[in-house]
């Protein structure tokens, strides 16, 4: 049984990504798009082109048919309902391009766009999409101190030598921040810097004043992490609230599931901050973008504030229903949003792809077994050392001769070591097979369960 249905766009004269819709959402999505097409006089593409101040040719150059539909739903809900849309497209369908289109829409419609995302290195990805939408000259206020926006199309240094000799381990929050900082330093060195965050003192002055310098910035770029200290420092949250009072604000929530989290059974500080903004500034408009928007009930609770769900149930009622109903209830809510034209998800079709060529490497079993045993020997030695260090640390803490120190459980890394080791055993053989197929004129796709970017970055 097919799990997806071919996506039929309302725009017939634009390039298509040949996407599909999950079968359980297909009927609702088709019905919603039909209503939208009828409401717009059968010219969805013309509606979007008009709102983005683009010719039909420019629109078709910038956006695929699927993306035009998503942008049309977002704009229509803002203008006709004062409500939001959840764009839940799979990676590769172009959520970033749709977000950039909404930034352009906001700029041209008298809004102050505020772009939220998960990591500040994604600011440069958004700039790339903004270039494609013809708004590269729009000046962002980068709220994250010390962060730059770079142009990936302008390389200033071809090669970068990595001197790091750190051993990779599963990342915690501090590790992620460190990795982001290292990547930002690499970006700043390797690509042309087009925009920079103001100096920390200047940013602080802007926050305290609660207003943007006149004619200095056109929109904001900010990460969710900027609100993580809002419990003890309300500076940034108050700044955003002040902007919402002074301007017509359009929030573009990229990686929107990151705006809704739970910590120790309670909504995270970031979630509380986002919810406070949405509750106290009902005049603001929003667009949510996330491929995993329904992975947790808390995400849906944040989104419901700006959709038809807000009229159907109170927050507490919906919260109880989602927790009791589990996944089936979340799917039902998703289908309700899709039917209302307030959620859309498109995915890549797997049709037409060649049968994967699996390389089991059985002929190398003895060699790989020997290599695996060598790695495991050293890992066991590290476990012994870790156990010894943990004992020493515990004694030191007992006698108050060491500051609080938490040892990372070495055994917890076994899964990741095994994962990397298996990849390394296969890499050479797979690469050789890929080269051979390329020489035969074939296009090669190497499927991986994980890019392991953290490791590759240091290789």
Segments from the language model and where they lie:
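Signature of the SF2 helicase/ATPase Hel1-core->accessory helical subdomain module
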Residues: 104-105, 121, 128, 225-344
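N-terminal accessory nucleic-acid engagement/regulatory domains that precede
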Residues: 1-39
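Conserved helicase/translocase motor-coupling segment
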Residues: 347-458
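Walker A/P-loop
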Residues: 82-101
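Inter-Walker segment of RecA-like/P-loop motor cores
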Residues: 137-232
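Conserved Walker A/P-loop ATP-binding site and its immediately adjacent core
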Residues: 96-98, 110-154, 294-299, 450
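Conserved helicase/translocase P-loop NTPase motor core
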Residues: 62-80, 215-248, 262, 428
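Conserved pre-motif I regulatory segment
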Residues: 29-86
């Amino acid at each position: 049984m097919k799990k997806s249905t071919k996506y039929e766009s309302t725009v017939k004269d634009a390039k298509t990504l040949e996407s599909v819709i999950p079968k359980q959402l297909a009927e609702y999505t088709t019905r919603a798009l039909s209503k939208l097409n009828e409401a717009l006089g059968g010219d969805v593409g013309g509606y979007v082109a008009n709102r983005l101040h683009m010719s039909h040719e420019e629109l078709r150059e910038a956006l695929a048919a699927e993306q035009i539909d998503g942008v049309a739903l977002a704009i229509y809900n803002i203008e006709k309902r004062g409500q939001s849309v959840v764009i839940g497209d799979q990676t590769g369908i172009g959520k970033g391009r749709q977000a950039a289109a909404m930034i352009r829409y906001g700029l041209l419609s008298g809004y102050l766009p505020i772009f939220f995302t998960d990591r500040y290195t994604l600011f440069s990805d958004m700039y790339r999409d903004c270039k494609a939408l013809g708004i590269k000259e729009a000046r962002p206020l980068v709220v994250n101190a010390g962060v730059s926006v770079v142009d990936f199309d302008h390389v200033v240094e071809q090669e970068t030598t990595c001197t790091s000799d750190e051993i990779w381990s599963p990342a915690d929050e501090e590790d992620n921040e460190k990795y982001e900082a290292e990547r930002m330093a690499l970006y700043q060195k390797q690509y042309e810097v087009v925009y920079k965050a103001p100096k920390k003192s200047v940013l602080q002055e802007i926050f305290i004043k609660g207003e943007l310098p006149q004619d200095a910035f056109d929109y904001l770029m900010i990460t969710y992490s900027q609100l993580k200290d809002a419990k003890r420092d309300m500076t940034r949250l108050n700044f955003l609230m002040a902007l919402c009072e002074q301007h017509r604000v359009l929030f573009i929530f990229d990686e929107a599931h990151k705006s809704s989290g739970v910590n120790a059974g309670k909504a995270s500080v970031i979630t509380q901050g986002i919810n406070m903004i949405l509750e106290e500034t009902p005049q603001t408009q929003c667009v949510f973008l996330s491929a995993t928007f329904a992975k947790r009930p808390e995400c849906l609770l944040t989104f419901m504030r700006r959709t038809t769900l807000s009229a159907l149930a109170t927050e507490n009622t919906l919260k109880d229903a989602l927790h009791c109903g589990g996944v089936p209830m979340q799917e039902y809510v998703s289908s309700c949003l899709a039917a209302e034209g307030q959620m859309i998800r498109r995915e890549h079709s797997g049709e037409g792809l060649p049968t994967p060529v699996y390389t089991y490497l059985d002929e190398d079993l003895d060699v790989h077994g020997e290599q695996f045993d060598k790695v495991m020997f050293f890992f066991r030695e590290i476990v012994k050392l870790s156990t010894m260090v943990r004992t020493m640390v515990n004694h030191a803490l007992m006698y108050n001769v060491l500051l609080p120190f938490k040892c990372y459980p070495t055994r917890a890394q076994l899964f990741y070591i095994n994962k990397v080791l298996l990849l390394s055993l296969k890499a050479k053989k797979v690469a050789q097979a890929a080269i051979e197929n390329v020489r035969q004129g074939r296009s090669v796709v190497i499927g991986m369960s994980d890019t392991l970017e953290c490791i590759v970055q240091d290789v």
